[in-house]
Structure formats: structure tokens, C-alpha cells
A protein has these predicted regions:
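Short amphipathic alpha-helical interaction segments
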Residues: 224-247
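Conserved catalytic cores of phosphodiester-cleaving nucleases, focusing on short active-site segments
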Residues: 44-79, 85-88
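A short, conserved structural fragment
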Residues: 240-261
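Acidic-basic catalytic patches of nuclease active cores, encompassing PD-(D/E)XK
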Residues: 1-52, 61-63, 95-100, 309-311, ...
């Protein structure tokens, strides 16, 4: 089995989250939780004197007076930016922990370290890039069998030793956050369509956008509140677009928008709906997802003139902070 595997940034994020949970999963060691780290933020922008800073994941330990900030570069790691790394290089620890709301026993002596997370196959070129451009960030590399630290040691000697010895990972870790800005519409549909069906089969024939976003986006409610609002807004907009398209295409007989109550209404499918009706709904789901995967064009909404709003544009605003 090769140790090389290309993970997306979202997959890298989920692997790291699994290393921070109280539950130890068979395929990933929860070393950050064991050492007292807790997740502070996920994809959240913080405006500092050196510009806007947005780490993919921020962990902090009050007992160790130390914060670890991860910049993840998935797949080919081709989006490493000098501007971004310069911002991290010149970041004031005291200013950042204050603006980010990080609890520190001693803010003056608190240490903050930026770590670049990449796929193992990109380790050599990332090391060469750092040498060439004058950066000195630790690199956390992810393979299908190992997770290891290189280039520079971490400020936390216990974590550093565990990572130098390598943390093993086999298979795919649990998924906590299911979407990000780069997720395809079909990724959302794979989770949203079965959820809509499950609503109806337990007697819930109306649902809000907020309800389905909460149910399909993030599996852990505690994490939902610390995800950056711009990322959540992008997911909300994709969910809205998905529901609109469903109601105009394969699901036009099953899904409609109730402008008065600001909710979506499920038709035909319910607790006692006939199995042939249920099968037809499920078939519509497969056809819809197949069209998304194959990028087959959908119909244009001819009822809305250019520059005008449709009734779907008045979907309820969500609290995404």
C-alpha cells in the first residue's frame, strides 16, 4: 500500500479535527486532544495590523500557553502564496490572540506557531519553496499511512516527538465538516436529498433553509459555531441554489417554496406514502445527482426577467456569525 494519497483541503481539515476530538478513532490518533489542545476556530478571518489573517484551523492550550495555527494546502499545493506567508511571518502573537479571543494565562509570553499542512507527495517542493523564499514554518505532511512533521520542530515538544515518530493513519477518517467553498453541487445533493426524504418519512413535511444547513453541513454542533461566517455563507448560498434547482427540475412535484411561511414544503412523500412513490422520489434523486456529476445543463428560469428577483431570492436570512 503506497503512503502517497492526495487529500483535498477539506479532507486535511477533517483529519486534523479527528486528532482533536475526545473520541479516539481507529485510524487516527487524537494526540492534540491528549495534550490539552482545543479547537478555537475554523476558517475564520481575523483583521490584524498586518492584514486579514485566516487560518484553516486554530488550536490552543491554556496550560501550555501555546497556540498552533494550520494553513492547509490540499491536492497539488499550488496555491501557496508569498503574500499569505509574509502575513503569518510578521504576525504579532499578542495582537492575534487578543483579536481572535484566545484565552491565554500569560499573553506576553504566549507562543503562536504557524504550521503548513500538505500532502506527503508535495513535501519536497514545499521544503524547496521555503528555502528559496526564506520561510521557516514547520510542515505537517499527510500520507495514507502516516502523518509526520518536518523542516522545523514544533514549539510543543510532546506533540513534536509524537509526530517525529509519525502518527499512523489508515483509510478515511470520520467526516465532521462535509462542505467548503470548493464543494461541488453534487456533494451537497448527496447529503441534502436523503435528508429531505428522511424529514418526510418521520412526518416533517416542511423545513427551513437553516434547518437543512444545520443537518447536512457539520456533524458536530459545537464546531458549527466556530466556523468562519464567510465559509458558512458560501455553503448556505449553495444549499439555496440547490433547493431552487431541485424544485424546478426532477423534484418539481415533490418540493415547493412557501413564501408566506419562509419554508420548503415536501409533497407526496410522507409517513405512509406508497413504496412506488418513495421509489420515484429516490429515482429522481439519482437522476438529479447524475446530471450534476455530468454537468448536464439545467433549464433556465424563464419566469424571471434579467435584473429581477424571484420569490426564492427572499429566502430567510440566516445567523451565520
Amino acid at each position: 500500500m503506497t503512503s502517497l494519497q492526495s487529500y483535498s483541503e477539506l479532507e486535511l481539515l477533517n483529519i486534523l479535527i479527528s486528532m482533536c476530538t475526545s473520541n479516539k478513532f481507529p485510524n487516527v490518533d487524537n494526540i492534540f486532544f491528549q495534550e490539552g489542545y482545543r479547537i478555537v476556530s475554523i476558517d475564520r478571518s481575523v483583521t490584524t495590523g498586518s492584514g486579514s489573517v485566516k487560518y484553516d484551523l486554530v488550536l490552543s492550550s491554556q496550560n501550555k500557553n501555546l497556540t498552533l495555527c494550520f494553513e492547509l494546502k490540499g491536492l497539488k499545493a499550488s496555491n501557496i502564496s508569498k503574500e499569505q506567508l509574509n502575513r503569518y511571518k510578521g504576525l504579532s502573537t499578542e495582537e492575534y490572540i487578543r483579536l481572535a479571543g484566545i484565552q491565554a494565562n500569560n499573553a506576553i509570553n504566549h507562543k503562536l506557531q504557524t504550521i503548513i499542512g500538505i500532502n506527503l507527495e508535495n513535501l519536497l517542493k514545499t521544503e524547496e519553496y521555503q528555502v528559496r523564499e526564506g520561510y521557516n514554518f514547520p510542515i505537517l505532511s499527510f500520507g495514507s499511512q502516516t502523518i509526520s512533521i518536518s523542516f522545523k520542530e514544533l514549539n510543543d515538544s510532546e506533540i513534536n516527538q509524537k509526530l517525529i515518530k509519525t502518527v499512523s493513519t489508515i483509510g478515511t477518517p470520520p467526516t465532521f465538516i462535509h462542505f467548503d467553498k470548493e464543494s461541488r453541487m453534487s456533494d451537497l445533493a448527496y447529503r441534502a436529498i436523503p435528508k429531505i426524504y428522511s424529514y418526510a418519512k418521520v412526518g416533517t413535511t416542511m423545513f427551513t433553509v437553516e434547518q437543512i444547513v444545520n443537518d447536512v453541513y457539520c456533524s458536530v454542533k459545537e464546531l458549527h459555531s466556530i466556523i468562519g461566517p464567510d465559509v458558512k455563507k458560501a455553503v448556505v448560498n449553495k444549499i439555496k441554489s440547490l433547493l431552487r434547482q431541485m424544485s424546478k427540475e426532477e423534484f418539481k412535484d415533490y418540493l415547493s417554496w412557501n413564501g408566506k411561511d419562509k419554508c420548503w414544503v415536501i409533497s407526496k412523500i410522507h409517513v405512509e406514502s406508497h413504496h412506488t412513490t418513495d421509489f420515484a422520489f429516490q429515482k429522481a434523486g439519482r437522476n438529479f445527482i447524475e446530471r450534476l456529476d455530468k454537468e448536464i445543463p439545467f433549464k433556465i428560469d424563464k419566469d424571471v426577467l434579467q435584473g429581477q428577483l424571484s420569490l426564492f431570492d427572499e429566502l430567510e436570512p440566516l445567523d451565520i456569525n
